[in-house]
Amino acid sequence: MDNIPNLTILEHSRISPPPSTIGHRSLPLTFFDIAWLLFPPVHHLYFYHFPYSKSHFTETVIPNLKHSLSITLQHYFPFVGKLIVYPNPHDSTRKPEIRHVEGDSVALTFAETTLDFNDLSANHPRKCENFYPLVPPLGNAVKESDYVTLPVFSVQVTYFPNSGISIGLTNHHSLSDANTRFGFLKAWASVCETGEDQPFLKNGSPPVFDRVVVNPQLYENRLNQTRLGTFYQAPSLVGSSSDRVRATFVLARTHISGLKKQVLTQLPMLEYTSSFTVTCGYIWSCIVKSLVNMGEKKGEDELEQFIVSVGCRSRLDPPLPENYFGNCSAPCIVTIKNGVLKGENGFVMAAKLIGEGISKMVNKKGGILEYADRWYDGFKIPARKMGISGTPKLNFYDIDFGWGKAMKYEVVSIDYSASVSLSACKESAQDFEIGVCFPSMQMEAFGKIFNDGLESAIAS
């Protein structure tokens, strides 16, 4: 990392909670968490306007971020712990957990870059490889006698001279979902802005670590289906490709209303439609049509799949609080024929199937966990898979460390996860931001199809 072009490392730090505030603690993984054990790390980037000198950055910002992260970690101890996994498939007595021991620390790197802040924090197509120096590696897995340990969280703060700051976060997905990560960031930002944790504790919601979701059968099934023998692999940072670009597209309320109208005009009896389902359906159809535009020859009957995460906290019986720590979502997998998706009514059919899939999952008579043992069966179907990363319900643009709200939020890990990022827009939480990563020629085709379709939706 010290030899990355356009990047100068200013400081490598290890941040621990205040002494004796946590001690030895562990957090068992649930069946929700285990599903993510073999997935690659999650990379997020936040850009902030910061038109100040390097001396102000080093003398004020760096100490404040160090201190506030230390204070925050005592309330979110799993972020500073290590993932413990026992790869031996014949040993069923020891389960994966996140364990903290006194002295554990988070890697916090401070750097300076010559990259263009205004370019990276814009919406237009930008080279993917320019984002990779701004997100930190997670750290290496270490094989002990009969288990493997792995850091679960790392941070990099990068200074753009007299223009901005970026905060890059990397976490293992088994650590948390977006809800937990959002709570952690809100807490850290509050402590950084105020200098103490009392405002966060008074006005926020400290995490709930109780493992009240107990379903031994689901747990064992999920654990047995996870090939832990392959876990001992150093996680790799996002690879580079000079031809890939990332861009952000905005779906305004007027666009979303037009898309809903198109769906309901053709399917007036459709029981469930929402801003989320029409957005996902529209993105999915635009991506496939952009591939056709690029000359892709795919059979009409070949299958396409789209995966969305359905939040489960409020849908369990009894429901879990929003500040429950960890992962708590279920995959909703929708399948459609390529010929239908790329056809004239592809968007409408995609939105219909996504809505029906979500509705069927959340309205089961036996609760959302009914047939949970079949959640992942769809992944076995031979089909091209795409999915959504993120949710517009959490406004990450509201994260303010004392320099104002974020100028731009990017999910860098969509570059290798075949996903599209979806978040609330920085100008209005009722508008959506969509982040995509494609080869440059496909991005041009996607942009034209996307924008032309929106013009048609508004005009109809």
Curated annotation (Swiss-Prot):
User: Do the record's keywords include Acyltransferase?
Assistant: yes
Per UniProt, the keywords (alphabetical) are: Acyltransferase, Phenylpropanoid metabolism, Transferase
* Active site: residue positions: 173 (proton acceptor), 400 (proton acceptor)
Characterize the regulation of its activity: Completely inhibited by 5 mM N-ethylmaleimide or 0.1 mM Cu(2+). Partially inhibited by 0.1 mM Fe(2+) or 0.1 mM Hg(2+).
Q: Could you say which enzyme class this protein belongs to?
A: transferase
* Enzyme Commission (EC) number: 2.3.1.171
GO BP terms = phenylpropanoid metabolic process
Q: Which InterPro entries match?
A: CAT-like_dom_sf, Plant_metabolite_acyltrans
Q: Domain of life of the organism in this record?
A: Eukaryota
Q: Name one GO molecular function term.
A: anthocyanin 6''-O-malonyltransferase activity
Query: What is the relationship between temperature and activity?
Result: Stable below 45 degrees Celsius for 20 minutes at pH 7.0.
The effect of pH on activity is described as: Optimum pH is 8.5. Active over the pH range 5.5-11.0. Stable from pH 6.5 to 7.5 for 20 hours at 20 degrees Celsius.
- Pfam families per the UniProt record, alphabetical: Transferase (PF02458)
Q: Which reactions appear under catalytic activity for this entry?
A: an anthocyanidin 3-O-beta-D-glucoside + malonyl-CoA = an anthocyanidin 3-O-(6-O-malonyl-beta-D-glucoside) + CoA
Which function does this protein serve? Answer: Catalyzes the transfer of the malonyl group from malonyl-CoA to pelargonidin 3-O-glucoside to produce pelargonidin 3-O-6''-O-malonylglucoside. Can also transfer the malonyl group from malonyl-CoA to cyanidin 3-O-glucoside, delphinidin 3-O-glucoside and quercetin 3-O-glucoside.
Family assignment? Belongs to the plant acyltransferase family.
Instruction: Report what the protein is called.
Output: Malonyl-coenzyme A:anthocyanin 3-O-glucoside-6''-O-malonyltransferase
Name the source organism.
Dahlia pinnata
The organism that produces this protein has a lineage beginning with: Eukaryota, Viridiplantae, Streptophyta, Embryophyta, Tracheophyta
